[in-house]
Curated annotation (Swiss-Prot):
Pfam families found in the cross-reference section: Conotoxin (PF02950)
Signal sequence residues: 1-22
Record-stated family: Belongs to the conotoxin M superfamily.
Lineage: Eukaryota, Metazoa, Spiralia, Lophotrochozoa, Mollusca
Location in the cell: Secreted
Free-text tissue specificity from the UniProt record: Expressed by the venom duct.
Record's protein name: Conotoxin reg3.14
Keyword list, A-Z: Cleavage on pair of basic residues, Disulfide bond, Secreted, Signal, Toxin
Domain of life the protein comes from: Eukaryota
Notes concerning its domains: The cysteine framework is III (CC-C-C-CC). Classified in the M-2 branch, since 2 residues stand between the fourth and the fifth cysteine residues.
Amino acid sequence: MMSKLGVLLTICLLLFPLSVLPLDGDQPADQPAERMQDISAEQNPWFDPVKRCCNWPRCNVYLCGPCC
């Protein structure tokens, strides 16, 4: 019984190797550095264009930009 399972597993791995599965690192949306480059501070709704900074309650350097 165990040898039959071994043969079946070997055949399955030969027909469908694990290397064809997509890895998580291959997805560009999964890389935080690239996600942060897609959003500029000026497009953020919390960004004050007159002061050119973010309002204090919503201020976060990683999300919006410089704080007021």
